[in-house]
Amino acid sequence: MPKMKTKSAAAKRFKTTKSGKIKRKQAYTSHLAPNKTTKQKRHLRKDGLVHKTDFKRIKQLIAK
């Protein structure tokens, strides 16, 4: 059976840490920003981690 190809769209959006977790950017950052408080925008700058329920699927998409 051939190797699975990496989905380039997913590879651009997710990065793997050395410990094996998957990092992602926060949603709600680029649109309607003036309506958000400075605190909200500051917290959205920080990367989040992929939730355990999505982990297996995302890992398959970015498999190398």
From Swiss-Prot:
InterPro entries to which the protein is assigned, alphabetical: Ribosomal_bL35, Ribosomal_bL35-like, Ribosomal_bL35_CS, Ribosomal_bL35_sf
Record-linked SUPFAM superfamilies: L35p-like
GO BP annotation list: translation
Statement: the UniProt record of this protein carries the keyword Ribosomal protein: yes
Compositionally biased residues, Basic residues: 1-26
UniProt-listed Pfam families: Ribosomal_L35p (PF01632)
Keyword Membrane assigned: no
Keywords annotated in UniProt: Ribonucleoprotein, Ribosomal protein
Domain of life: Bacteria
GO MF annotation terms: structural constituent of ribosome
Any Gene Ontology CC annotation: cytosolic large ribosomal subunit
Annotated spans, Disordered: 1-46
HAMAP family: Ribosomal_bL35 (MF_00514)
Family: Belongs to the bacterial ribosomal protein bL35 family.
Protein name in the entry: Large ribosomal subunit protein bL35
